């Protein structure tokens, strides 16, 4: 776990997220060519906005899995907004034919799934905190 720690001026952290979001109406538009471009875009967005993408994959042509690490100053909602907003706009610019398969000019569903990923379980944290008062 210690090798995953990120050191900032005022804190040390290890904040990881597994995110999943899908194409509007679950349309299967994420072809190999679109996926390759999207993977590049996601890396560029992450670098520009200050977080790290460790793993990115498209599933079944209609949804995306992304594993990221981020500093505490970046909320998960901001990260998702950057990834979905910027990638959606740029994919429409690069592949205008995608727009024909969707309505209202939106590529991604409004919702998303996110889960914190860590090396310490909830049970370990509870046990550690419960034993703090017994140390004195």
Language-model segments: what does each one mean?
Residues 1-136:
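Basic nucleic-acid-binding interfaces
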């Amino acid at each position: 776990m210690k090798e995953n720690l990120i050191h900032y001026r005022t804190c040390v952290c290890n904040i990881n997220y597994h995110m999943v979001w899908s194409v509007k109406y679950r349309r299967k538009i994420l072809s190999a060519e679109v996926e390759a471009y999207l993977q590049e875009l996601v890396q560029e967005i992450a670098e520009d906005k200050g977080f790290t993408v460790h793993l990115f994959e498209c599933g079944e042509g209609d949804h995306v899995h992304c594993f990221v690490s981020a500093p505490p100053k970046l909320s998960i909602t901001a990260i998702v907004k950057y990834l979905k907003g910027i990638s959606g706009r740029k994919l429409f610019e690069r592949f205008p034919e995608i727009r024909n398969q969707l309505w209202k000019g939106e590529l991604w569903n409004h919702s998303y799934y996110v889960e914190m990923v860590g090396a310490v379980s909830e049970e370990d944290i509870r046990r550690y905190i419960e034993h703090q008062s017994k140390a004195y």
